[in-house]
Amino acid sequence: MIIELAKNYGFCFGVKRAIKKAEQIKDAATIGPLIHNNEEISRLQKNFNVKTLENIQALSNEKKAIIRTHGITKQDLEELRKKDIEIFDATCPFVTKPQQICEQMSKEGYEVVIFGDENHPEVKGVKSYVSTKAYVVLDKKELQNIKLPNKIAVVSQTTKKPEHFMEIVNFLILKTKEVRVFNTICDATFKNQDAIKELSLKSDVMVVVGGKNSANTKQLFLIAKTNCEDSYLIETEEELKKEWFLDKKHCGISAGASTPDWIIQKVIAKIENFRIN
């Protein structure tokens, strides 16, 4: 059986930057998980004493706080700055961009449509920078019964599929007089999604490695599953089952943006140890 890695996979720029920052700072607390990968979070806690707090209210005697890659709300940032604590911002620049856009567009009188999951920390943070009105949607149908203003700005959660974002944009263009469209989908998302699409079309089994609470990993899995029925989403090599690979000829592997290479290599090694001819 051939084992092939996607052309683009794993750690993105923002995650690499955050991990490096956490390793250098040490002995700190993150507000929410730094990234959506439980194994890497555990490694940072064990080796660098970087612990994860649920929210700002959980801070007690910590001297250093790291803002997660997904960012935090504007209100939480203001609250954090009032505390006697050193702040290190690990928000991904691709996430900071829609925050800034929302703030500026609001000042110019635009209401904002955010394409994304309203429960995702990134989207909560982005929405908090809107001072007019924000509409968080996952489908154009959610906009059909809303009385839209004449001026709308549109941004996307960084990990969404571009074609779905365009469905929202095309709907709005027909419904309102002025639409400002900002492509806030991350470059790494484009590349990883294109790569897994290509690989899954020629594979008869696919393994996607990453946190099951990771939005970008779940998107990769959905793309793989669309093209390859026998697709599996795992967090560690312990979840692999030999029967997945029996009678298979081509195994494709991809990984979410928060998945470190050391986990991916363990997955590959275990599949190789199954010795599937």
Swiss-Prot record:
Keyword RNA-binding part of the UniProt annotation: no
Cofactor remark from the record: Binds 1 [4Fe-4S] cluster per subunit.
Keyword Iron belongs to the record: yes
Positions of isopentenyl diphosphate binding: 36, 70, 120, 214, 216, 258
Pathway where it operates: Isoprenoid biosynthesis; dimethylallyl diphosphate biosynthesis; dimethylallyl diphosphate from (2E)-4-hydroxy-3-methylbutenyl diphosphate: step 1/1; Isoprenoid biosynthesis; isopentenyl diphosphate biosynthesis via DXP pathway; isopentenyl diphosphate from 1-deoxy-D-xylulose 5-phosphate: step 6/6
GO BP field: dimethylallyl diphosphate biosynthetic process; isopentenyl diphosphate biosynthetic process, methylerythritol 4-phosphate pathway; terpenoid biosynthetic process
Active-site residues, as the UniProt record annotates them: 122 (proton donor)
GO molecular function: 4 iron, 4 sulfur cluster binding; 4-hydroxy-3-methylbut-2-enyl diphosphate reductase activity; metal ion binding
UniProt: (2E)-4-hydroxy-3-methylbut-2-enyl diphosphate binding residues: 36, 70, 120, 158, 214, 216, 258
Reactions mediated catalytically: isopentenyl diphosphate + 2 oxidized [2Fe-2S]-[ferredoxin] + H2O = (2E)-4-hydroxy-3-methylbut-2-enyl diphosphate + 2 reduced [2Fe-2S]-[ferredoxin] + 2 H(+); dimethylallyl diphosphate + 2 oxidized [2Fe-2S]-[ferredoxin] + H2O = (2E)-4-hydroxy-3-methylbut-2-enyl diphosphate + 2 reduced [2Fe-2S]-[ferredoxin] + 2 H(+)
Residues engaged in binding [4Fe-4S] cluster: 12, 92, 186
Pfam families, per database record: LYTB (PF02401)
Signal peptide residue numbers: none
Entry EC number(s): 1.17.7.4
Keywords: 4Fe-4S, Iron, Iron-sulfur, Isoprene biosynthesis, Metal-binding, Oxidoreductase
InterPro entries to which the protein is assigned, alphabetical: LytB/IspH (IPR003451)
Binding site for dimethylallyl diphosphate: 36, 70, 120, 214, 216, 258
Cofactor needs: [4Fe-4S] cluster
HAMAP family from the UniProt entry: IspH
Function of the protein: Catalyzes the conversion of 1-hydroxy-2-methyl-2-(E)-butenyl 4-diphosphate (HMBPP) into a mixture of isopentenyl diphosphate (IPP) and dimethylallyl diphosphate (DMAPP). Acts in the terminal step of the DOXP/MEP pathway for isoprenoid precursor biosynthesis.
Family: Belongs to the IspH family.
UniProt name for this protein: 4-hydroxy-3-methylbut-2-enyl diphosphate reductase
Protein's organism: Campylobacter jejuni subsp. jejuni serotype O:2 (strain ATCC 700819 / NCTC 11168)
Organism classification: Bacteria, Pseudomonadati, Campylobacterota, Epsilonproteobacteria, Campylobacterales
